Amino acid sequence: MIVTTTPNIEGKRIVRYCGVIAGEAILGANIFKDLFAGIRDIVGGRSGTYERELEKARAIALEELQQHAVALGANAVVGIDLDYETFGKANGMLMVSVSGTAVVVE
């Protein structure tokens, strides 16, 4: 499946728009506690532990997005947008959300 931030796919023609779809993944407060406990992971101002968790959450959100696209009969998703939001008590949770338009291309 093709998943892209662009509104179209070069060399492909959109033949059907299936609808707007989304995928989400939420990281709980425990990851933030673990990050502070594992401060030794920070190298050059970056936390490998935190980055791995964000990558995992992003992958989950994108996989969910693709599953929704397949359920609608789409073979591509165009115009995707990734967002990161903190919420909950003391912003203790992080949500990764992705949305886009499911399409059929030829």
Swiss-Prot record:
Name of the protein described by the UniProt record: UPF0145 protein VC0395_0288/VC395_A0976
Family statement: Belongs to the UPF0145 family.
Organism: Vibrio cholerae serotype O1 (strain ATCC 39541 / Classical Ogawa 395 / O395)
Domain of life from the UniProt record: Bacteria
